[in-house]
Amino acid sequence: GWVAKVGSANEKPGITGISHLFEHMLFKGSPRIGVKKAKLDDSIRGELDEIRNQMIEKERGYREQVRLGYGEAVTDSALQDDEMKALKKEFDALIEKQRENLVKDEFDQVYTAAGASGMNAFTNQDMTVYFIRVPKNKLEMWMWMESERLSQPVFREFYSERDVVFEERRMRTESTPTGAQDEVFNSMFWRGHPYGWPVVGWPSDISAITREQAASYF
């Protein structure tokens, strides 16, 4: 395996959880792995980013309406206008189109076909670790595979995977008896230090991270 000396302590408010999100994203392949048509995939990712940016602008307006007391949250159906509904519909259609162009879990399949097993990763405050067991005669292949995803990351299925991470947070924190209290205690103990925010990220940050922010952080 290998270790990247980057974890939640390297983040800043607004993008907490992004290191853990990368742990997920680097399993999505490269321009040559995990997709049928790379150019189509590039085009779809660009369109998704553009639509998402338009949605963010709309959400800023909704946030102002919430501040003025016209709603309780930016997701309130009463605040959603026809333009936002159309953007969401177009966004969902592109997500489905992207999925049809994917070769699901091809990165893992290549390794498995070569006799490898146990591929996994974890993130903490100071590092992100990727590991796998490979036959001793497949070391060159391992080097090629790992350099492929490090040198040519595509952040494929970014917004879908972001939702997966958000659900992981809910299971790890909100759905456990002491999860929320543990987070509060940790943030108080490490006041003013990056160790004070959770590795998985604050919910408001996870739901707002964009692919452009991810590319800049990488």
PLM regions and their residue ranges:
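Acidic/histidine-enriched segments that form metal/cofactor-coordinating
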Residues: 28-217
